[in-house]
Amino acid sequence: MIWKKPTVNEITPEAYDEVSNLKHIEQCGRICYDSLNKMTEWSYGDFYQTIVPKAKYNPEECCDFHLSVLEHATIYLHIKPSTEKELWLVDFFIHNPYSKVNENAPMGGGIRRTEHTYNQDGPYPGVDYYITTNWRVLFENEAKMVNALGLEDSIFDFTQSYRTLTPDSCYAIRRTFVVETGIDITREFNRHRCLSISESSTRWIDPTLPNHGGHVPFNDFETGDHTLLFTDAYKSAEENYKRLRRVSLRPQIARKVLPLGTGSTVVYTAFEEDWNKVLRLRSKKAGAKGVHPDAILIADMIYDYLNA
């Protein structure tokens, strides 16, 4: 076994062109599968093809794919509609629960357009709309959008001319963090539905193999006078895991003997305003009370990033 200190690192991209987004998707996915060492300058294309359906996406048929990592790739669009297609596109994002739309925000902020505050006259021609969405929204809705807009190319190609590669304060900004802590603490954060979440796989990854560290990681926390008890318990759990693996049981079966203190790595992405809502419930620095001390530790580190 090995003790691992809780950590938080920000991996929000600096650019949002298509290649940068694909590289970000690969990075988030490889964190889940502990294969960052396989990333190269050009590996993003092949990796993307391993996590999405080879045929045209059908949500009723395609379920055995890792689409959650697509959510971490943020897409920023600036649309000043003058055609029916552009008006339809703005309307789509206003009603999409995973997107945020700011209207007329040359100095930042502006008017937030949502489904609940939406003027039923529809988007207005000639008005600036600053849209923040993510790759999965376009991917899962592509058939609907292509059909509604009468496109011959993909929705990704159609929206290229509206992309903003370096977003400013006109947009609702999204931030991505990599969190290393125990599974018991990731559960605290995974309850927040505003977060896009991709967690390291214990179904496919055997941490006791040399290429995955050679030991089961356990979250390092304040054990007081009971350090030896926890150490013995974790060593026993690791040995039981190894014993099950030695009789050819797969990781997804052997993992059943691992405790909630087992270390985990999670990628979280959310709008800044949603992060602030989470922190008000989890971070001592944001005024939260009665929160698990290990969750406070993680939340306070995220708070420091957001307020740097």
Each model region followed by its residue ranges:
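Family-specific signature for flavin-dependent thymidylate synthase
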Residues: 1-308
